[in-house]
Structure formats: structure tokens, C-alpha cells
UniProtKB/Swiss-Prot annotation:
Record family assignment: Belongs to the allene oxide cyclase family.
Induction, per UniProt: High local and systemic induction by wounding.
Species: Arabidopsis thaliana (Mouse-ear cress)
Gene: AOC2
Listed name of the protein: Allene oxide cyclase 2, chloroplastic
Purpose of the protein: Involved in the production of 12-oxo-phytodienoic acid (OPDA), a precursor of jasmonic acid.
Domain of life: Eukaryota
Amino acid sequence: MASSAVSLQSISMTTLNNLSCNQQFHRSSLLGSSKSFQNLGISSNGSDFSYPSSFTAKKNLTASRALSQNGNIENPRPSKVQELSVYEINELDRHSPKILKNAFSLMFGLGDLVPFTNKLYTGDLKKRVGITAGLCVVIEHVPEKKGERFEATYSFYFGDYGHLSVQGPYLTYEDSFLAITGGAGIFEGAYGQVKLQQLVYPTKLFYTFYLKGLANDLPLELTGTPVPPSKDIEPAPEAKALEPSGVISNYTN
């Protein structure tokens, strides 16, 4: 029995010593980890966990670089507003528009489609610049206003200068505003809105673009003083006859 007691005491002491050694090892590990956290600038106090100041500084520096260069704040989308006026005229020689009926009625109804293309002239009516091309979807026939509400998606083509695209409501009974959704050529990056004025439905319309986002000023030949909109407007004879003095370079036809 005495030898058994000695053995049990020996085992117990060995186990306690091992536990003590393990506890000291874990304490040393924790202290080492804590020092490592401190060296990194990271707090190990649970909810007080934080990034090192050097990391925060680098993050702020990166953000600053993204926003500025040479000390100047950059605006990736120029906000200067440039006005551009054009006339859209249907001269009844382009087999446009086409009416694709989906509604079961003689009048326009929801879902009817109207693809179209018309001629485009500068606001001063001195030059032919190109065409419009797009699609109108009938949203509603408005009998009390003797007109229609369309949802329109179309583009304005300006020969070598590029094109502008728009989307929004086209109301045949009152003025409306559409969103400028983009452009190409000199109109790359364009955004803003365009005012549509119905002069003679569906053959004469006047547009005033309020353009933002352009890298450069608009060409002078596109920005002549516009003729006041009226139902009696007509393009200059040179523009209508497509004479060299009456068109822009490589006008879109």
C-alpha cells in the first residue's frame, strides 16, 4: 500500500508539473502574441481591435490619390453645361414612321411600336447634320388631350462628330424632357437632359440639349443662333439640297 501511495503521489506530481508547464507555455505564447499585436499596432482587447495607424494612413493616402493629382481635386465628369439646338424634320421621303400594331384597337394603345428615322438640321437651319433613328413604344392614348404618350429611345447622328442617345417620355400634346444617356465621338461622356418641343405632329420637332460631361467646347458650326421654333420653319435651300455649304462633314444620311 505504501508503494502504491508513492506511485500515485508521483503520478499526481508529474501531472501537476505538466499542467504547470503547459500553463506557463500558453502564458508565454499569449504574451508573445500580445507583443506581436503591439508591434503591428493592433489591439488584442476584443472589441478594441483596430488597424495599425500605418495601415489607416496608407488607406487614406490611396483615397487621396484617387481623388486628387498634383494637389487638385479631379472631377471625372465635367459639369459645364453646353446648349445645342437642332430641328428634326420628317420630309416624308424616308418611309418613316412605321406603325406596328399590338393593341386591339384602331387608336394607339399600350404596346404599339413606332420605329422611325427623320432628318436633322442645325438650330439655325443652315446645315443638314444627319438623322434621328430609334423606337417609340406607345404607353397611353390620351383622348382628353388629343394625343399620345410614348416611351422613346433614339439617337441623333452628326456625321463625323459622332452621335447622342436619349431616352424618356415623348408627349405629342406638350413639351417634355428626356435624359441624355450617352454619346460617341465629340459627345463621348455626355449626360444631362434635352427639351423636346412638338411643333407639327409628327413632322417638325425642336430640341434643346443641355449637355454636360463633354471634354471640349462644341464646334461653332453646330452652335449658331437658333431660329425661334414655330410650325412654319424650313431648312435653308442649301441645306435641303445637300450643297457643300449646307452640310457638315460626312453628314449622316
